[in-house]
Amino acid sequence: MLSHAELKQGFHYFMMGWHLITQKGLRRFVIMPILLNIVLLSGLFWLFITQIEKMIGMLMLSIPDWLSWLSSILLIFAILMILVLFYFVFTTLSGFIAAPFNGLLAEKVEKMLTGENLVEGSVWDFMKDIPRMLGREWQKLVYSLPKLIILFLLGFVPVLGQSVIPIIVTLFTAWMMAIQYCDYPFDNHKVPFFVMKAELAEKRALSLSFGGLVMLCTFIPLVNLVVIPVAVCGATAMWVTHFRDHLAMKPLNQEGVSRVSTVSIVK
């Protein structure tokens, strides 16, 4: 049973993300994710326009003749599945390309919210940390891709693929959005990936409502240009309130979680 209070909190942290990106000390760290977002969305929009007719045709051919009277409704679900597929491609690419910048933004947001000085280092220290950040993105991909492939293939199953599967895909995508953006502050503290998933699962309603709003805004023109830094800021605020003190109380790995690994380039 999803908690009504947690659902409201997900909305709160998402709106808090919008507030945080306007703060003076954070604006310069928001610019690069936005620029990368514009480039990626432009390329994927072109790909979507050129391929959507072909993909819809493939999905609609899987519908048996005796369900032709449902074709209009099933067409909507087919389009939804394709949108989610392109959304997954977008978030995967943006995750790999913008990971260092998002980690840095999460660090700055946490510093602003807590008032604590986080570990800072040189540009070289930052560069050395990039492979670890990209490795974390690879973990997310390994976790999500097999599940999405299975769901996509099930989308070709008559009736099931055009009714139940799109709903499951939507919920799973919302869950992945929570994982994608909440992971930046978790990873800054070297919290293992499996621990991060378990913590978010304990507050599933909070995670799904936050991730669902991020997913929804990705489909809104212009709004989707800034949704990545908004999500990073909101997820970091969620980390500070719900997870930071709790996880700092127990040793999660040999390196611990008290040291922030993402370094500052600009003081």
Curated annotation (Swiss-Prot):
This is Sulfate transporter CysZ. InterPro entries: CysZ_sulfate_transptr (IPR050480), Sulfate_CysZ (IPR022985). GO terms for molecular function: high-affinity sulfate:proton symporter activity. The lineage of its organism: Bacteria, Pseudomonadati, Pseudomonadota, Gammaproteobacteria, Pasteurellales. It is a multi-pass membrane protein. Keywords: Amino-acid biosynthesis, Cell inner membrane, Cell membrane, Cysteine biosynthesis, Membrane, Sulfate transport, Transmembrane, Transmembrane helix, Transport. It comes from Pasteurella multocida (strain Pm70). The chain crosses the membrane at residues 29-49, 73-93, 149-169, 212-232. One of its GO terms (cellular component) is plasma membrane. GO terms for biological process: cysteine biosynthetic process; sulfate assimilation.
